[in-house]
């Protein structure tokens, strides 16, 4: 017989996922109304890197339609992040200390802000460097010209944006792992070399196989890992304070 509390947790999880999914769908529908303008903005780094006479193309008749659908889904995800993070918080909140529950709004704002900052950093600073390098590398031989598919470009862009967004979530993740007692700043400091290796592995998996793209992911990862050590130290202190307050209340 399935425990009643497990059924309640699963029902709560289903409800939270439905709300988060509904917010994502609504965001995607709103963004689809502006999908062509969004694609012009998203493709700007590549179009600026293309040599004269080259342009984005579509290979299949349905490619523009599905490209705009995928772009709307990605933009809708970014737009609905505050709702998604709020639902995540609402699901885990019953197991937290009263003092930790007060972190709801900071968690939602910080998580959404960090993901947005990562996407903004990738798009504004890394995309121009990466696509300029890739296009110049591919066209350095005189008889080769660039003719890039809009669908392939968007797929690569989405992977990069998600990668930068997730990497910038590292301090938030470490903060809560510290609050739960899973890691501490001493443990993180002892594993700097492992983190450096992991940074390049993540860069190799999520980016094109060129050194510029991999360094663009690995560099922020290493910097944010050092930031996470400081965050872990602060999180450990606050966790001890919260535990003391809970014991005093009892």
UniProtKB/Swiss-Prot annotation:
<dbReference type="InterPro" id="IPR002033">
    <property type="entry name" value="TatC"/>
</dbReference>
<comment type="similarity">
    <text>Belongs to the TatC family.</text>
</comment>
<dbReference type="GO" id="GO:0033281">
    <property type="term" value="C:TAT protein transport complex"/>
</dbReference>
<comment type="function">
    <text>Part of the twin-arginine translocation (Tat) system that transports large folded proteins containing a characteristic twin-arginine motif in their signal peptide across membranes. Together with TatB, TatC is part of a receptor directly interacting with Tat signal peptides.</text>
</comment>
<keyword id="KW-0997">Cell inner membrane</keyword>
<dbReference type="Pfam" id="PF00902">
    <property type="entry name" value="TatC"/>
</dbReference>
<keyword id="KW-1133">Transmembrane helix</keyword>
<dbReference type="GO" id="GO:0065002">
    <property type="term" value="P:intracellular protein transmembrane transport"/>
</dbReference>
<feature type="transmembrane region" description="Helical">
    <location>
        <begin position="160"/>
        <end position="180"/>
    </location>
</feature>
<feature type="transmembrane region" description="Helical">
    <location>
        <begin position="107"/>
        <end position="127"/>
    </location>
</feature>
<keyword id="KW-0813">Transport</keyword>
<dbReference type="GO" id="GO:0009977">
    <property type="term" value="F:proton motive force dependent protein transmembrane transporter activity"/>
</dbReference>
<feature type="transmembrane region" description="Helical">
    <location>
        <begin position="73"/>
        <end position="93"/>
    </location>
</feature>
<comment type="subunit">
    <text>The Tat system comprises two distinct complexes: a TatABC complex, containing multiple copies of TatA, TatB and TatC subunits, and a separate TatA complex, containing only TatA subunits. Substrates initially bind to the TatABC complex, which probably triggers association of the separate TatA complex to form the active translocon.</text>
</comment>
<keyword id="KW-0811">Translocation</keyword>
<keyword id="KW-0472">Membrane</keyword>
<feature type="transmembrane region" description="Helical">
    <location>
        <begin position="19"/>
        <end position="39"/>
    </location>
</feature>
<keyword id="KW-0653">Protein transport</keyword>
<keyword id="KW-0812">Transmembrane</keyword>
<feature type="transmembrane region" description="Helical">
    <location>
        <begin position="211"/>
        <end position="231"/>
    </location>
</feature>
<keyword id="KW-1003">Cell membrane</keyword>
<dbReference type="GO" id="GO:0043953">
    <property type="term" value="P:protein transport by the Tat complex"/>
</dbReference>
<protein>
    <recommendedName>
        <fullName>Sec-independent protein translocase protein TatC</fullName>
    </recommendedName>
</protein>
<feature type="transmembrane region" description="Helical">
    <location>
        <begin position="133"/>
        <end position="153"/>
    </location>
</feature>
């Amino acid at each position: 017989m399935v425990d009643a509390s497990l059924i309640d947790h699963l029902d709560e999880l289903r409800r939270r996922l439905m709300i988060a999914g509904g917010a994502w769908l609504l965001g995607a529908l709103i963004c689809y109304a502006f999908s062509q303008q969004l694609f012009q903005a998203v493709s700007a780094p590549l179009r600026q890197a293309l040599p004269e006479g080259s342009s984005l193309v579509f290979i299949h008749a349905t490619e523009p339609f599905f490209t705009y659908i995928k772009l709307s889904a990605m933009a809708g995800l970014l737009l609905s992040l505050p709702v998604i993070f709020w639902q995540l918080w609402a699901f885990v909140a019953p197991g937290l200390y009263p003092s930790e529950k007060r972190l709801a709004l900071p968690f939602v704002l910080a998580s959404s802000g960090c993901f947005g900052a990562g996407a903004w950093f990738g798009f504004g600073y890394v995309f121009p460097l990466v696509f300029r390098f890739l296009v110049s590398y591919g066209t350095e031989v005189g008889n080769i010209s660039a003719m890039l598919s809009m669908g392939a470009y968007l797929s690569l862009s989405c992977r990069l944006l998600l990668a930068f967004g997730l990497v910038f979530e590292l301090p938030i993740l470490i903060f809560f792992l510290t609050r739960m007692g899973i890691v501490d700043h001493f443990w993180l400091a002892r594993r700097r070399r492992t983190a450096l290796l992991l940074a390049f592995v993540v860069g190799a998996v999520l980016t094109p196989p060129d050194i510029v793209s991999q360094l663009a992911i690995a560099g922020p990862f290493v910097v944010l890992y050092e930031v996470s050590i400081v965050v872990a130290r602060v999180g450990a202190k606050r966790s001890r304070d919260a535990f003391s307050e809970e014991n005093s209340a009892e």
